[in-house]
Amino acid sequence: MRKLLTNLPAAAVLSAQVYSAVLQGLWEENVCGTPGRTRVCTALLYGQVCPFQDSTDGLRTITSILFNWPPENTSVYYQPPQRSSFRIKLAFRNLSWPGLGLEDHQEIVLGQLVLPEPNEAKPDDPAPRPGQHALTMPALEPAPPLLADLGPALEPESPAALGPPGYLHSAPGPAPAPGEGPPPGTVLEPQSAPESSCPCRGSVKNQPSEELPDMTTFPPRLLAEQLTLMDAELFKKVVLHECLGCIWGQGHLKGNEHMAPTVRATIAHFNRLTNCITTSCLGDHSMRARDRARVVEHWIKVARECLSLNNFSSVHVIVSALCSNPIGQLHKTWAGVSSKSMKELKELCKKDTAVKRDLLIKAGSFKVATQERNPQRVQMRLRRQKKGVVPFLGDFLTELQRLDSAIPDDLDGNTNKRSKEVRVLQEMQLLQVAAMNYRLRPLEKFVTYFTRMEQLSDKESYKLSCQLEPENP
């Protein structure tokens, strides 16, 4: 990065989206609050070239902008700049400024403001200010993905199958509670899988069954680490403004399937993991009740390991899947689960449903950081703690949807509403920084198995559950 800056003398380096926004003047009020920021933004607005490689204030200002401006889909907030007095040269580069809290943060667009040739200036362009040069600006290139994909890409889920904002609901059908069975819980609406005449546990498309691993062959700690890695990568990619009720809440309407793609990708992963757990318990017709009990115990151990990794997302999904109707009504299976595992499951249910926000604050250790006004100091403090945290995104979606529907968009209540929404998004932003502290490696064998595993649909799961352990007449 330092070498690149050296090769760009007198260059203003910033993301292309932020550059366009500053040209529109949309950030003057919110960003230009300090003298250093005022100098930088004023220079950008009037076409001056700032040698940021020699300016600590400039580096800190760009750091703050990068952390607070939405990295994708910025067309929601502004239109492309109409001015033709600027020119920007783009390059893609991993940003790393030691000491400023941006190590391994994201891949960004680097831009260089350059002076055009004299014949490039258009006669109808507005006259530049005294002492300044006229510049031209071509169309910006699209930014690359902010984070590298984890191993093989997850299979795309059908957007139409993702539920509306109230996607947390109870699964259909009766839910008889086993003797020591877990309490009923809310689950994500599972993604419907293609119909299969004979579903097989752990069956993977286009591979012979004898080569397939059993889910229980993966140690609980390894499973927890791989799930945590997937959850962390997805959560870091979530674009915060897509979680707002006014955006995500409209995604289920016809014609809005393209809205909130990062949120939809995260929910699709929730659904896939839920179906994976259900299929591992029900998909093999040769399994007996005691075999299914061992699988249930295995997933309880995985959830416990996820909790030790502060992966509250997978903890919620695993507990919800085990408490769903297809698995929860297996009386013989639950009778074979050890008392120790049942006790652990009850503790997991209690921690999953009670005081989630307090657990997140304690796990992420950012209670003090939220009171810090300097954004760079907050980021550096979280990075030094080296504690990774992955929250359950559904909690934030539910809260933001409630704020959007409960508080009207009138003049009196709008300020209060937006303040509460911003507070939630700020917490999510801090947790995204904490999610960067994981140092885990993907296991190709597990990723391939997880992404290509054939899964049971809702109807198949419930029907098979009733066939394996029918209710007493």
From Swiss-Prot:
UniProt cross-references to SMART domains, sorted A to Z: RasGEF
Keyword Glycosyltransferase: no
Subcellular localization: Cytoplasmic vesicle
Compositionally biased intervals (Pro residues): 173-185
A GO cellular component annotation in the UniProt record: cytoplasmic vesicle
Pfam families documented for this protein: RasGEF
UniProt GO molecular function: guanyl-nucleotide exchange factor activity
Biased composition (Low complexity): 134-157
GO biological process, one term: Ras protein signal transduction
Region (Disordered): 117-215
Ras-GEF domain mapped to chain residues: 219-471
InterPro entries, alphabetized: Ras-like_GEF (IPR008937), Ras_GEF_dom_sf (IPR023578), RASGEF_cat_dom (IPR001895), RASGEF_cat_dom_sf (IPR036964)
Principal location class: cytoplasm
Keyword set, alphabetical order: Cytoplasmic vesicle, Guanine-nucleotide releasing factor
Keyword Magnesium: no
Listed PANTHER family: GUANINE NUCLEOTIDE EXCHANGE FACTOR, RAL-GDS-RELATED PROTEIN
Name under which the protein is recorded: Ral-GDS-related protein
Organism: Homo sapiens
Gene that this sequence comes from: RGL4
